[in-house]
Design a protein with these regions (language model features):
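Inter-lobe coupling linker of SF2 helicases/translocases
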Residues: 1-110
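Short glycine-/polar-rich loops that comprise or flank the Walker A/P-loop
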Residues: 42-44, 131-132, 176-179
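Phosphate- and divalent-cation-binding pockets in alpha/beta enzyme and binding domains
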Residues: 58, 121-125, 191
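Short alpha-helical
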Residues: 93, 120, 143, 169, ...
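Alpha-helical structural signal in soluble globular domains
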Residues: 99, 124-132, 198
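Conserved helicase ATPase core of P-loop NTP-dependent helicases/translocases
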Residues: 111-115, 123, 130-168
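A short beta-strand element within the Helicase C-terminal
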Residues: 172-185
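Conserved SF2 helicase motif VI
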Residues: 188-198
Length: 198
């Protein structure tokens, strides 16, 4: 259809799907993960924590006061920034418990992946495990990222992979791990399912 002097294509929906399938069937190969990899079923176990640090309590008090104080007058950017600050404090307050969970898994002779959204949290968890851990974040080069993946997959001394949920949550294979821990969650549920499938 035309908009002004321009011709615009309507790309809503699809047509001629059978013809498309016939023409591409000799060139397209589709394999599903469940058809190729023999992986065990996922077991999801929520772990609830009671956060009581002074920093957390102070920030939550500030956040609730802020929420009650006519937040419609504040821009979405300010609202999002405040929410991110709260999320980051929560992530930092979970580090000790996350490290304890990881240590329990390592004691069983298993490898574990830890995902987080925040670089400071990622670094603190990786530093806690020292030479037993590798990390992957968005600042790393492709070569460094692949090195972290290879080390985790192939080196028996490396027991912990700590990754940024966005940077390490897709496009890599970490099948050496038997457990995945989400230190903190994304706003997007599909990020979690992608990361769990590493």
């Amino acid at each position: 259809f035309n908009v002004g002097n321009r011709k615009v294509w309507n790309v809503n929906g699809a047509s001629n799907l059978l013809e498309l399938r016939d023409r591409t069937k000799t060139h397209v190969l589709r394999r599903l993960k469940q058809d190729i990899l023999d992986l065990p079923d996922k077991i999801i176990t929520p772990v609830y924590l009671n956060l009581k640090s002074k920093e957390y309590m102070a920030l939550m008090g500030e956040y609730y006061d802020w929420m009650e104080d006519d937040r419609e007058k504040k821009s979405l950017t300010v609202q999002f920034s405040m929410l991110m600050k709260v999320r980051q404090i929560i992530a930092e307050n979970k580090i000790n418990e996350t490290c304890e969970l990881v240590e329990n898994i390592i004691e069983q002779g298993k490898k574990v992946i830890v995902f987080t959204n925040f670089t400071d949290t990622l670094n603190r968890i990786a530093d806690h495990f020292g030479k037993k851990a590798v990390k992957l974040d968005g600042k790393m080069s492709k070569v460094a990222r692949q090195n972290s993946v290879d080390q985790f997959q192939e080196n028996d001394k490396i027991k912990v992979f700590v990754g940024n949920l966005k940077a390490a949550g897709v496009g890599i294979t970490l099948t050496a791990a038997e457990a995945v821990i989400m230190n903190d969650l994304s706003f997007v549920p599909s990020d979690h399912s992608q990361a769990e499938d590493r």
